[in-house]
Each structure stands twice: as C-alpha cells, then as structure tokens.
C-alpha cells in the first residue's frame, strides 16, 4: 500500500489550475491575498503557480513562498514540465519557503504521446527518472504527475510510477485530466496502482481531476477509499473547462460522513479525529474571497457555498427546519463559517473598526491599501446608511484587484431616457497623467460608456459579457459589475462596485482594459498546451 499520512492531505491548486479558468487571471496582490487565506483555511499544500510561464508568475510564486510559507505553514509548491529549465525556475521560485515542493509532470496516455508530445513510451520512461532525479537534487519534496492517467494504459502507468519513485518522487499524482473516468473506474485505477507498483509504499498517492462529466468529487471520494491520501482541488471548483474537484465539497463530505470513511483509514467508526486539517469555519470566507477576486460567480445552488445552500422555500421544509434543523439540514451553516450575525458599520465607524472587520473577513491590507479602502468606505457611507460585510468585500476586492494602471477613469457622465438617445461622456487618464475626453452614443447608457472608453483607449477588443448583481439588499445596494473582454482568444475580466451601476460599468471596463494590456505584455506559457524542449534528450 502507498504511504499513509493517517488523514487526507488537501492540495489547493486554485492559484495554478483554478486561475486557468477563462477570464480568471489574477495579479500578484490578489494571488497573495488568496494564498494567505488558504493558509488560514489550513490546506496542506498551496500550488502557487507555474514559475517558468512568465516573470510575473515566477514573482508571484516567490512572493507567496516568502510571505505565506513558514515552518508551521503550508507547503509551497510550483508546477514544472519535465524539463531542466522549468524545474530550475520552479526550485528558485519556491526556495524562500521552509517547506517547498516541485511538482513536475509528463503525459502518459497514448493520445497525448502521439499528438501532443510526439514521443514514444520509451522516450517517456527515459525522461521521467532523469527529470525527477534532477528535481530531487534541488528539493527534498518532489511530486510527479502522469498527465492524462485516466486514459493511460495501466501497465505502462505502473512502469512510469515505479521509475518516478525510484528516482526520488515522494508523491505520485494520478490526474483524470479530461474528467473522463467514472467513480468505479477511478477507484479501480488507484487500487491497481497500490497492487502492482512494487515501491508504492515509498510515496503518497495523490489525485487530480476535472469535472467535465460532473464526477470529479465522486471520483476523489472513491479514490480515498482505495488508498489516495492527497486530493488536488480548488476553491469553488474553478478551473479549466468545467472546473476541478471542489475543495469545500470534498472537505465537507469527509467531515459530515466521517463515520463512513473512518474504517478506510484503519480507524474506529466513531473516531472523532478529523480526516483533514482544514478549518471548516473558514470555508465561506475563502469562497467569497476567491469569487470576488476572480470574478467567477458562485452558482446559487452550489453545494456548501452557494447562496441557496442553506435556504428553504418549501413550506413543508421550512416547518421541519423550524422544529428541528436536522430534519432537512445535514450541515450546520456555522460549521462552514456562515452566520446570521453581522456587525453593521456606518459613517461614524472609525478606521480601526473597519480594519478589524476586514481582518475578520480574511483581508490583510498594507497601510496604503487600508487608507484607500477606508476612504472608499467613508465615501460609500455618505450614500448608504449601513455598510455590510458584502459591501466591504466589494470595496476591498476592487481595491486589491487593480492591475498596473495603463488607464484610469476620471469622469463618467450620461444622458438617457425614454425620449433621449443614450449618450456618454468619459474622461480617461493615461499612465503619464494626460487627460483625454470623448463621447459616444449607444443602445443604452452602459453601451455608450463602453463605446466611449473603447474609442479613447484604442485597444482592439470584443466585449463578450456584461453582468451586474446586487451586493446587498435594498434600494441603496451597491451594484457589482463584471465585464469580460476578448482579444486573440484570451479573456480578461474587470470588476467594480458602486451604488451607480453605470459608473461601476465604466470602472469595470477600464479594469478589464488594464488587465488586457498587462496580459498581452505577460504572454504566459500554458503548462499543458505549450511545447517543451528537453535539452538533454537528443531525439526530442
């Protein structure tokens, strides 16, 4: 059997695989804020990014290693393809963390070997020990992944895994890269690895899976029953295509059904010892932070963290819950950090009160950021009687979300009505502080604002999504606007909140434009899609 740490290790890849969601790109400060909250949540490993992809990705992983990694903190991990350049960049990026890991991978399925890598099985069997051994010479903790393991020939998979462990891999990850397998198949795959890889006892078995068929969480839970002891997942299940296995669903399934899973860990059924180290009361806070910073809205009926997860509409259900919550609720909402209690702030609230509440919500702002957030808070408090947690989250998300500003919105004015043609006048500041003003007409005030901004910026793009939601209840609620722009096949999101949704739309559009410009300059590699040259392999 594989090495058993006695519980399930939670490997969070929100900052790497989760960020690959279309339009979910994060800047350095956003990544740092999420990493700090993941540490509070109690995850075991944070995969902070793909350091070789770009200088920005390298800097983000390095900064997280410096500020979040610690002797008692999470392991800080970076992803690297099976190449010396990737692995060396990864080692350098995670070096500041006392507990660090290199996660390297290569595909093992025939379809990937033939069409993506153009390599033979023999080539892969030569590359794996060489690259794992090189990674192990740089760090003590090396994870190796067999990309597309779910569609790989099991016998070949066993050979590759055995070679990786012999070369020094301490964790073996089995990805269902395209979300193809069913729970019984995935469980059998893990069981087969335990049975047929002679040295599997020297490594922890990890699993990684995508949700293309909606089976990722079910697959993982079946894998746990068959010996997997590390689960690679993301907050809110975000990720490429249909997303990844959801951290909150996995953790709460193991928490609520602990008596069922305990025997698979050799425990008594009634053992009260948690199966993960996650602090479940931090789940809701973490979910909201990730949603706010990525702009990926959580669907209302999403398990555990959706707005309706603890709501009851049916009269029969409401009656039952009022008499005894256990009639229709298997989870106490407070267990995941959802509470009806709230501290309302207003225009008389001071800086210390705002700072304290932000810290409780998971935001650790610098003095400069706090000053700006407090100024924004006071401005909002003049227009809105009561400032709620969701208002604060919107303010700070907007604050820390700002990419390096190529453009800055100074003025928005609109005229519209039933007998008027919607017209907008906007003023933009460029990075040198020069002002330009322009006007445009549109089908509505928001369309007019976006057209005017586009004309001034001169950055070709296609607006593919505009959405607005109310941050809180009431007629004075802030409107949270998300705008997504597309250019050269890449998506860029902008978000902003204001009590005036037209102003918020202008701010969100400029935010998206700044991200687009920064993204064009960044030109990141994609770990699974970009080619790699292996310097030491003459046949490649």
Curated annotation (Swiss-Prot):
Cofactor(s) the protein requires to work: Mn(2+)
Gene Ontology molecular function terms on file: 2-isopropylmalate synthase activity; acetyl-CoA C-acetyltransferase activity; manganese ion binding
Subcellular location: Cytoplasm
Top-level taxon in the UniProt lineage: Bacteria
Pfam families xref list: HCS_D2, HMGL-like, LeuA_dimer
UniProt-listed GO biological process terms: L-leucine biosynthetic process
Primary localization: cytoplasm
Pathway: Amino-acid biosynthesis; L-leucine biosynthesis; L-leucine from 3-methyl-2-oxobutanoate: step 1/4
EC number: 2.3.3.13
Residue ranges of domain Pyruvate carboxyltransferase in the record: 8-271
Record's GO cellular component terms: cytoplasm
Disulphide bond pairs: none
Record's keyword terms, sorted: Amino-acid biosynthesis, Branched-chain amino acid biosynthesis, Cytoplasm, Leucine biosynthesis, Manganese, Metal-binding, Transferase
Top enzyme category: transferase
Keyword Transferase belongs to the record: yes
Keyword Amino-acid biosynthesis: yes
Chain segments carrying region Regulatory domain: 408-540
Residue sites binding Mn(2+) per the record: 17, 208, 210, 244
Catalytic activity, reaction form: 3-methyl-2-oxobutanoate + acetyl-CoA + H2O = (2S)-2-isopropylmalate + CoA + H(+)
Assigned protein family: Belongs to the alpha-IPM synthase/homocitrate synthase family. LeuA type 1 subfamily.
Assembly description: Homodimer.
General function of this protein: Catalyzes the condensation of the acetyl group of acetyl-CoA with 3-methyl-2-oxobutanoate (2-ketoisovalerate) to form 3-carboxy-3-hydroxy-4-methylpentanoate (2-isopropylmalate).
Protein name as catalogued: 2-isopropylmalate synthase
């Amino acid at each position: 059997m594989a090495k058993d740490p006695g519980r399930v290790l939670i490997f969070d890849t929100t900052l790497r695989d989760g960020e690959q969601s279309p339009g979910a790109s994060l800047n350095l400060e956003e990544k740092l804020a999420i990493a700090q909250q993941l540490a509070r949540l109690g995850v075991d490993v944070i995969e902070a990014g793909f350091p070789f992809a770009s200088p920005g990705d390298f800097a983000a992983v390095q900064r997280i290693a410096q500020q979040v990694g610690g002797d008692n903190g999470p392991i800080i991990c970076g992803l690297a393809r099976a190449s010396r350049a990737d692995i060396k960049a990864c080692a350098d990026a995670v070096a500041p963390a006392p507990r660090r890991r290199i996660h390297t991978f290569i595909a093992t399925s025939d379809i990937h070997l033939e069409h993506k890598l153009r390599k033979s099985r023999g080539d892969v069997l030569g590359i794996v020990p060489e690259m794992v051994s090189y990674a192990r010479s740089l760090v003590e903790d090396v994870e190796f992944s067999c990309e597309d393991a779910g569609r790989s020939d099991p016998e070949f998979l066993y050979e590759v895994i055995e070679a990786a462990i012999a070369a020094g891999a301490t964790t073996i990850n089995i990805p269902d890269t395209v979300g193809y397998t069913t729970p019984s198949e995935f469980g059998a795959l893990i069981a087969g690895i335990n049975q047929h890889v002679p040295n599997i006892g020297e490594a922890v078995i990890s699993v990684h899976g995508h949700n293309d068929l909606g089976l990722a969480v079910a697959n993982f839970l079946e894998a746990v029953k068959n010996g997997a002891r590390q689960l690679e997942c993301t907050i809110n299940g975000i990720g490429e295509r249909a997303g990844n296995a959801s951290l909150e669903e996995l953790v709460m399934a193991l928490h609520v059904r602990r008596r069922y899973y305990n025997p698979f860990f050799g425990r008594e059924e009634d053992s009260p010892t948690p199966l993960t180290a996650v602090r479940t009361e931090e789940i809701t806070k973490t979910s909201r932070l990730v949603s706010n910073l990525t702009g990926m809205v959580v669907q209302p009926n999403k398990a555990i963290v959706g707005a309706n997860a603890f709501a009851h509409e049916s009269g029969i259900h409401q009656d039952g819950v009022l008499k005894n919550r256990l009639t229709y609720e298997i989870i106490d909402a407070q267990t995941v950090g959802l509470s009806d209690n709230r501290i309302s702030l207003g225009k008389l609230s001071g800086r210390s009160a705002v700072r304290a509440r932000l810290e409780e919500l998971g935001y650790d702002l610098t003095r400069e950021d706090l000053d700006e957030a407090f100024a924004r808070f006071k401005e909002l408090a003049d227009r809105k009687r009561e400032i709620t947690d969701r208002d604060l989250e919107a303010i700070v998300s907007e604050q820390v979300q700002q990419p390096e500003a190529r453009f800055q919105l100074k003025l928005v004015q609109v005229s519209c009505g039933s007998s008027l043609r919607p017209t907008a006048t906007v003023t933009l500041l460029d990075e040198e502080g020069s002002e330009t003003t322009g006007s445009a007409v549109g089908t509505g005030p928001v369309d007019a604002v976006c057209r005017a901004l586009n004309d001034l910026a001169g950055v070709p793009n296609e607006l593919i999504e505009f959405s607005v939601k109310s941050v809180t209840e009431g007629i004075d609620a802030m409107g949270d606007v998300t705008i997504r722009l597309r250019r050269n096949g890449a998506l860029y999101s902008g978000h902003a909140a204001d009590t005036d949704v037209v102003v918020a739309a202008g701010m969100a559009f400029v935010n998206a434009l700044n991200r687009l410009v920064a993204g064009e300059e960044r030109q990141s590699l994609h770990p699974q899609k970009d080619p790699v040259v292996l310097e030491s392999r003459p046949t490649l």
